[in-house]
Amino acid sequence: MEKYLSVAEMRSVEREANENGLSYATMMENAGTNLALWINGEYNLCNPRSALALVGSGNNGGDALVALCRLIELGWHASACVINRQYENDPLIQRFLRMGGSLFDWEGNATEAILSNLFQHTSVLIDGILGTGARLHLHQDMARILDY
């Protein structure tokens, strides 16, 4: 039998894990790594082996960035489109860029044509914007990118 957690239960589990020595950073590495391994196992035969993550400002965005880094290590091409994330001093973004990932800023260089091309030529799309902290009504930019 599968067990699903509510948002409140998930936050409680994470808080308790952190209090018992499993840091939020380690949880993020674990989540991103396991997502990448699953993607690689399920979609390894895709041609091209490319992944695009929509990366928001929360922990879900961090999970997505870790997954992209792991996919690069596994031979994938990876792109990230950041949405409402301050990335200039973000260590996960810097790691992703050092590994050869392509970064697009929804509010900067990610034109409609670039995004359309990315969406059409990527094998896997990772949602790194809507996590447990997501609230309805979505910000106009977020709703627009999800329309793709």
What are these regions (language model features)?
Residues M1-L5, N44-Y148:
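Glycine-rich phosphate/dinucleotide-binding loop and adjoining beta-alpha-beta core of small-molecule
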